[in-house]
């Protein structure tokens, strides 16, 4: 083995499985691994997976030059309310702003509407005497006595973390910084987050909610990242350790510990990146990314080879399909919709006698009934096993055997008998309900973005995604379904395709026809300098750093903005024309027309500073499988249920590793690989393209 050999590892921790991908940078060889997540200590599964993967690949820890990690740990802590006991220091009179929220209701006609409770209870939200004007002028100096008293009260109340969010601190952070110093003096060792660092932009409610969420998960994420870094060091891995951000870039652990709120949805973001890379490689201008794992399902629209981006999202929605029903998090993110629908989603019969699936999940412990680890409640995986879609002896490539009788017993006792159905009917009901739930979520996502999903091929991945993709695609009426090679660990591939990157934002309201170009240039210069410093500390050479500028703009009097590109270089009055044209083009794409004679104003200015995009292909042969067979003959047949066939039928089972470009066959068919299984229903036409992508297209009978 050459001493110059180097490799990279991508690690994606999900609620049920932890996926790893190892890539040899010298030969391009790839190894994929899937391991049960260890909920009590997620780093255990990472450690086990890295050791096993390196052993299988014949590699060594000393060769690993980088590990890129995505996790849903911060997301789960927010949803399950398992973060730190958090206190809030805010401007006098604004103690309840984080609970009042917006005047708008996400459901106008529901008088019993539920809104998510703030992360900080009222008795831990304390006021300090100070006031800043909207332009950054100090109206009332910070009263140190009131500040000391408030910090002391939080200490006595057992606060484990403190959020500081003062009115208009995005324009002048001097009071927040003074409070931060007082916290270090009076509450040493207690983590502190200031809004001027976490989200230095206008909008009080979103800024406060985000700052509270950041410090709420900070102790948990710091402990986790410290522990994982230590374990990787003990394994002898000398390379860099990076964390995926929700925006699709990666950052160092030091940055991630300071702003852990940017890790929320980092795992799903990696899957969207992989789908975007695949769209470019396949020449598909549009894709609907569909990632179904063990706990959740995610849908993301890919346009022109890029995922849609948003500057805000919600967590812990009271109503999963309604905007405004969750906690607002104001950080850059890849825009997607996520619901509790995965292989481990629990099926039950409610008090009305209706079948419900999810959002609760069996996770990895105890897992579905068929895992034989103590689970008694039927899950989607149990239903898929009963229907014949999964091979009990080939789950995870044969490393884990599934108990068919346990699955059948759970479905029969918990669903079939209460509903007066046969076991098969109950299993199909579970399968169909979860498909309808996921399709409905994807449809909502498309409608919110003004997209007609009938024009978007479905790109399916995740451990459970290919099992359900054909039926979900039929519900959505997509033109075709694409399943990549190595679909079960595609999010881990996406981690290896992410550049080092970070976003910066500043608020400064400017009417374009009377803009202070010197101030705007100063803001961009300040953010670009800060961004270059962050990337240089992470080891990125100055010559390969790229910078993207944008501004959030609107017509005067409007309440929300449209983000548009801003040219590089020094801006002046001559820049007004190109910037205005960019805004009008973007506005017209969203609203079909532009108002005449209304001045345009910019509210927020943003900079994204990025390193080079790593080279990796997410399609084509992976070097992680037995040599391809020439024959297209199925490796076996088994009984699988399809309602179109009115029952169980002998269904050919193909070895995914034996399929070659140009192969095609009709459905029904089952295609197996180690980390996932693809199910093609009756009427499907399956073919393999030159990158080994499995493509399912409906015949007329299947439309």
Set out the residue ranges of the language-model regions.
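N-terminal glycine/serine-rich phosphate-binding loop of ATP-dependent small-molecule kinases
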Residues: 1-87, 133, 140-163, 176-181, ...
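C-terminal, non-catalytic interaction/recognition modules in large multi-subunit enzymes and RNPs
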Residues: 3-5, 13, 145-149, 153, ...
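Conserved phosphate-binding loops in N-terminal lobes of ATP-dependent enzymes
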Residues: 10-13, 17-21, 29-45, 49-51, ...
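Short beta-strand-loop/turn "lid" adjacent to the catalytic site in phosphate-handling enzymes
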Residues: 18, 31-34, 61-101, 163-176, ...
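Glycine-rich phosphate-binding loop of actin/hexokinase-like ATP-binding domains
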Residues: 20, 25, 30-40, 87-93, ...
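Conserved short loop/turn motifs at secondary-structure junctions
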Residues: 65-66, 163-172, 214-217, 427-432, ...
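Glycine-rich beta-strand-to-loop/alpha-helix junction loops that act as flexible
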Residues: 71, 166-167, 195-197, 246-247, ...
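Conserved phosphate-binding/catalytic loops in two-lobed NTP-binding clefts
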Residues: 186-210, 477-493
């Amino acid at each position: 083995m050459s001493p110059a050999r180097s490799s990279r590892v991508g690690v994606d921790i999900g609620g049920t499985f932890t996926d790893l991908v190892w890539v040899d940078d010298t030969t391009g060889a790839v190894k994929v691994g899937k391991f049960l997540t260890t909920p009590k200590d997620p780093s255990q599964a990472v450690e086990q997976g890295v050791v096993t993967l390196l052993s299988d690949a014949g590699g060594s820890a000393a060769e690993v030059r980088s590990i890129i990690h995505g996790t849903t740990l911060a997301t789960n802590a927010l949803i399950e309310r398992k973060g730190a006991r958090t206190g809030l220091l805010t401007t006098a009179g604004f103690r309840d702003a984080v609970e009042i929220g917006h005047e708008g209701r996400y459901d106008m006609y529901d008088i019993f509407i539920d809104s998510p409770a703030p992360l900080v209870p009222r008795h831990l939200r304390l006021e300090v005497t100070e006031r800043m004007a909207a332009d950054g002028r100090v109206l009332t100096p910070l009263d140190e006595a009131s500040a000391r008293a408030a910090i002391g009260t939080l200490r006595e109340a057992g606060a484990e973390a403190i959020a500081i969010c003062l009115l208009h601190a995005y324009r002048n952070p001097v009071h927040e910084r003074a409070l931060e110093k007082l916290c270090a003096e009076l509450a040493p060792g207690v983590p502190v987050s200031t809004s001027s660092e976490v989200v230095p932009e206008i909008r009080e409610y979103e800024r406060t909610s985000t700052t509270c969420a950041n410090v709420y998960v900070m102790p948990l994420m710091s402990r986790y990242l410290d522990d994982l870094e230590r374990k990787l060091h003990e394994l002898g891995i000398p390379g860099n350790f990076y964390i995926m951000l929700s925006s699709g870039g990666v950052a160092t652990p030091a940055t991630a510990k300071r702003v852990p709120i940017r890790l929320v949805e980092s795992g799903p973001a990696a899957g969207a990146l992989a789908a975007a890379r695949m769209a470019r490689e396949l020449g598909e201008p549009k894709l609907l990314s569909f990632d179904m794992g063990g706990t959740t399902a995610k849908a993301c629209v890919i346009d022109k080879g890029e995922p849609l981006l948003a500057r805000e999202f919600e967590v812990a929605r009271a109503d999963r399909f309604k905007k405004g029903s969750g906690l607002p998090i104001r950080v850059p993110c890849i825009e997607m919709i996520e619901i509790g629908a995965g292989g481990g989603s629990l099926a039950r019969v409610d008090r009305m006698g209706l079948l419900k699936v999810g959002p609760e999940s069996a996770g990895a412990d105890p897992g579905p009934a068929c895992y034989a680890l103590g689970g008694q409640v039927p899950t989607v995986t149990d239903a898929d096993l009963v229907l014949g879609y999964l091979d009990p002896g080939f789950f995870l490539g044969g490393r884990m055997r599934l108990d068919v009788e346990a699955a059948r017993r759970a479905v029969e006792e918990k669903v079939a008998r209460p509903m007066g159905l046969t076991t098969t009917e109950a299993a199909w009901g579970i399968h169909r309900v979860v498909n309808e739930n996921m399709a409905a979520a994807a449809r909502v996502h498309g409608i919110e973005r003004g997209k007609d999903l009938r024009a978007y091929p479905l790109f399916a991945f995740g451990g459970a995604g290919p099992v359900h993709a054909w039926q979900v695609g039929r519900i959505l009426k997509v033109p075709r379904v694409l399943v990549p090679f190595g679909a079960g660990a595609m999010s881990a591939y996406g981690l290896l395709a992410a550049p080092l990157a970070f976003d910066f934002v500043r608020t400064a309201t400017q009417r374009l026809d009377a803009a202070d170009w010197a101030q705007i240039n100063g803001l961009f210069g300040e953010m670009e300098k800060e961004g270059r410093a962050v990337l240089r500390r992470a080891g990125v050479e100055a010559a390969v750093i790229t910078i993207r500028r944008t501004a959030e703009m609107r017509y005067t009097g409007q309440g929300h903005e449209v983000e548009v590109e801003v040219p590089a270089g020094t801006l002046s009055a001559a820049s007004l024309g190109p910037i205005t044209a960019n805004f009008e083009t973007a506005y017209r794409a969203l609203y079909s027309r532009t108002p005449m004679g209304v001045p345009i104003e910019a509210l927020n200015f943003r900079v994204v500073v990025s390193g080079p995009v790593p080279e990796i292909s997410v399609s084509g042969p992976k070097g992680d499988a037995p040599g391809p067979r020439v024959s297209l003959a199925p490796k076996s047949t088994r009984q699988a249920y399809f309602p179109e066939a009115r029952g169980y039928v002998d269904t050919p089972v193909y070895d995914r590793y034996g399929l070659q470009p140009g192969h095609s066959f009709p459905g029904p068919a089952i295609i197996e690989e180690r980390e996932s299984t693809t199910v093609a229903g009756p009427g499907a036409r399956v073919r393999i393209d030159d990158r080994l992508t499995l493509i399912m297209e409906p015949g007329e009978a299947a439309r």
